[in-house]
Structure formats: structure tokens, C-alpha cells
């Protein structure tokens, strides 16, 4: 059996905990990725798609009215302006190109909020690949606009009714499908989690977020920000923002997990701060589990953060202290969702609203000149019906 070319671990986290039948597929994927990263033609095609199809670089917007503190500037990295409406498009284009390079004809994906599903559907339509998306039945119900978008672009959307009928279960079904079809299909995983080499692949295809932010900050302010802030579910938008700043010790890295109804309740999705290490979804990582080691259901108002585990690099950054991880409740995210709309005329995704909420809270407590950058990971079109129902007093 050939050796791995990349380190599958981040400290103690990560690995490749999958059925033996999938090991050759993952090794083939790793080899293809390493070769593609060294291929100038592949890199040129990926860069061209990001620029001329997806619309990069995205803007870095200085908010005019959001900061509650005159000493604090809050910038937004505008991934909401990317084609598809969220950061997901970056790495999906990369993986879809990689799948074509490997000769795959079909794409299997999972989705929570539907943003990864939409991004996968658009990439498959563009590149002529068959597309199958697994989505928890609960998420199908609460994200109907994205379900329609996926189907409009030719994707087959498969509702998953097992378990909690959310992202965790969609991930399991997608992995199960891939186990029987990997010779012709590529599993296009949507976050920086799962078995090696997915966390590394997703990070590398998302790191453009932080690279652009660093360049734009130096142009605008002549210095790096004091902190970069991003919401964390599986963790792809956050690792995309963090990656280029990890070796910049002056820049604080802050991830914001969903506290749901409250960290002191069972209704949250914060495994980094309140989970225990376990094996899930092909990786060793912090995991929400009960005293018997069974996976507990996560909860968040935002479907894209409703995940009981987290990517292994985030676990490592937390363990080493290089990044810190905070949380924001549903109520705080809802308030930030409305605040950004009213203050700046920008409607954020509920996922991104968690990061906005923490940034405003942090700004309030700053006692010196400070620059914060929030990764506005997606736009809020998909969430307006959910938020409208809540504000009108309906149960969601």
C-alpha cells in the first residue's frame, strides 16, 4: 500500500477513519490533489474560474455604522458577493476541477443550509458533471429557496430522514453512497472536516479568502488587522480566513460557534468548547457526545452551523491556543442579522451573523484603536423566511 504524501493529522486531530473500501479512493484523491497543486495549467484554470466566473477578488468593506466604539473599525470580507452567494463556491470549483482531472463523471455532495449544494450544482452545470446532493429533511423544509436553485441547475436533491434529519445525517448518507460508487463518482465534501485529505484540500481551495484580506488590509490601512473573526460549523470559511494569518502572531484568530438556545442547555452546536474528542465522519475531532459516547444532536438556528463536530485543524488551533473560539446564541445572531441590515444595508447569512454578533460585542469592550475583520461568509436571502417567521412569533 502506498504511503500518504501529506500529513493526515493536525496535532492529535484528523486522520482517515473510514471503511477499508474507501482508503484507495482517498489515497487517489490525495495524489491527484498534490499533482494538481504542482500543475501550472490546473492552477491557471482554477484562478481564471475564481476571477471570471465567481467574481474574485471580493470586496473588503469598512462598515460605517456597525461599530459601537469610535476607536474600533469593523471591516467585512464580502464572500456574500461571490457567485452562488457564499464562500462555498471557492473550494467547490477547485474540487470539481479536480474531479474532472481524475476522470470522474458524477459528483456526490451533502449540504446543510443549501449553500454548498447550490455551489456544487452550479459547478457541475458549468463543468458538465452529474450532481447528487444529500440534504437533511429538516433542512430541505427550512431552506426551500436553495433546494429550488439546486434543482433548477440540474442537481438531484435527496432528502435524508434518518437520525435528526440534518447535516450530520446528510454527511453519513453521502459517505455511504460514495462507498459504492467511488470509481465513477467524486464525493465533494463541503467543509474542512471529514477524513484526510479533505480538511487540507478544502483549506487550500479556501485560503484565497485570507490571502486577499491580507493584501487588501495592507493597501487600505498599511497594516494587518488586530483580529479576524469567522463563524465555525465544520469550519471552512473560518479556516479559509485564518490560513494566511496563522503565521502572523500579531493577528488574533477568533472562531464563533453557535450557542443556540444557550451553552448551558442541550440546544447548541459548540463541540470545540463543550465536546469531547471522538471519532466521527472519518476523523478524530471534538464531538458533541453523551456520557455513553453516543453522538448528541447539535442545534443552531442556522442550518449551516448545525453540526456536532468541527474540522481537525480548528481543534488543533484551539488546543495550541493559536486561535480562540467563542460562541453566539440564536438571539444574538438574530439581532446581528437585523443590525447589519439596518446599519449597513447588507443582509448576512444567519451563519455569518454569529460572527457579526461577536465582533460588535468585542468592539464594545476594546479600549484602544483596533481593526477587526469579519468574514461575511454568505448572504442572507436564504434566511429571510426563517427570520420573518421568528419575528412574527411563529415556531420554526
From Swiss-Prot:
Keyword annotations from UniProtKB, A to Z: Amino-acid biosynthesis, Aromatic amino acid biosynthesis, Lyase, Pyridoxal phosphate, Tryptophan biosynthesis
Classification via Gene3D superfamilies: 3.40.50.1100
Cofactor(s) listed: pyridoxal 5'-phosphate
A GO term, aspect molecular function: tryptophan synthase activity
InterPro entries documented for this protein: Trp_synth_b_CS, Trp_synth_beta, Trp_synth_beta/beta-like, TrpB-like_PALP, TrpB-like_PALP_sf
Modified residues (N6-(pyridoxal phosphate)lysine): 88
Domain of life according to the entry: Bacteria
Catalytic activity: (1S,2R)-1-C-(indol-3-yl)glycerol 3-phosphate + L-serine = D-glyceraldehyde 3-phosphate + L-tryptophan + H2O
Annotated signal sequence range: none
EC id: 4.2.1.20
Cellular component GO terms, alphabetical: cytoplasm
Pathway: Amino-acid biosynthesis; L-tryptophan biosynthesis; L-tryptophan from chorismate: step 5/5
Family label: Belongs to the TrpB family.
Subunit structure: Tetramer of two alpha and two beta chains.
PANTHER family: TRYPTOPHAN SYNTHASE, TRYPTOPHAN SYNTHASE-RELATED
Chain's role: The beta subunit is responsible for the synthesis of L-tryptophan from indole and L-serine.
Protein name: Tryptophan synthase beta chain
The species this protein was found in: Shewanella baltica (strain OS185)
Underlying gene: trpB
Amino acid at each position: 500500500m502506498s504511503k500518504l504524501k501529506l500529513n493526515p493529522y493536525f496535532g492529535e486531530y484528523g486522520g482517515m477513519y473510514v471503511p477499508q473500501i474507501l482508503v484507495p479512493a482517498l489515497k487517489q484523491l490525495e495524489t491527484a490533489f498534490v499533482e494538481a497543486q504542482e500543475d501550472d495549467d490546473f492552477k491557471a484554470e482554477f484562478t481564471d474560474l475564481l476571477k471570471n466566473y465567481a467574481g474574485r477578488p471580493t470586496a473588503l468593506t469598512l462598515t460605517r455604522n456597525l461599530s459601537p466604539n469610535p476607536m474600533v473599525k469593523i471591516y467585512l470580507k464580502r464572500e456574500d458577493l461571490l457567485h452562488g452567494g457564499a464562500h462555498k463556491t471557492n473550494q467547490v470549483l477547485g474540487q470539481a476541477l479536480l474531479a474532472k482531472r481524475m476522470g470522474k463523471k458524477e459528483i456526490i455532495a451533502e449540504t446543510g443550509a443549501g449553500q454548498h449544494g447550490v455551489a456544487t450544482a452550479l459547478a457541475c452545470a458549468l463543468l458538465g458533471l452529474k450532481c447528487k446532493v444529500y440534504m437533511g429533511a429538516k433542512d430541505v423544509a427550512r431552506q426551500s429557496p436553495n433546494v429550488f436553485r439546486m434543482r433548477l441547475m440540474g442537481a438531484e436533491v435527496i432528502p435524508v430522514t434518518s437520525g435528526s434529519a440534518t447535516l450530520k445525517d446528510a454527511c453519513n448518507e453521502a459517505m455511504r453512497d460514495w462507498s459504492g460508487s467511488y470509481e465513477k463518482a467524486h464525493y465533494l465534501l463541503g467543509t474542512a472536516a471529514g477524513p484526510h485529505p479533505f480538511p487540507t484540500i478544502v483549506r487550500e481551495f479556501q485560503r484565497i479568502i485570507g490571502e486577499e484580506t491580507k493584501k487588501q488590509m495592507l493597501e487600505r490601512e498599511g497594516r494587518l488587522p488586530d483580529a479576524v473573526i469567522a463563524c465555525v460549523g465544520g469550519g471552512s470559511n473560518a479556516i479559509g480566513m485564518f490560513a494566511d494569518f496563522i503565521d502572523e502572531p500579531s493577528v488574533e484568530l477568533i472562531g464563533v460557534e453557535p450557542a443556540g438556545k444557550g451553552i448551558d442547555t442541550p440546544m447548541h452546536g459548540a463541540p470545540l468548547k463543550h465536546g469531547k474528542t471522538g471519532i466521527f465522519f472519518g476523523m478524530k475531532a471534538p464531538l458533541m457526545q453523551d456520557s455513553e459516547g453516543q453522538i448528541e444532536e447539535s442545534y443552531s438556528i442556522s442550518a449551516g452551523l448545525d453540526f456536532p463536530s468541527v474540522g481537525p485543524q480548528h481543534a488543533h488551533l484551539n488546543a495550541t491556543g493559536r486561535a480562540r473560539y467563542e460562541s453566539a446564541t440564536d438571539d444574538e445572531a438574530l439581532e446581528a442579522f437585523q443590525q447589519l441590515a439596518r446599519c449597513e444595508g447588507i443582509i448576512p447569512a444567519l451563519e455569518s451573523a454569529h460572527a457579526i454578533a461577536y465582533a460588535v460585542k468585542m468592539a464594545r469592550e476594546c479600549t484602544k484603536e483596533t481593526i477587526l475583520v469579519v468574514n461575511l461568509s454568505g448572504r442572507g436571502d436564504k434566511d429571510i423566511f426563517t427570520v420573518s417567521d421568528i419575528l412574527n412569533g411563529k415556531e420554526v
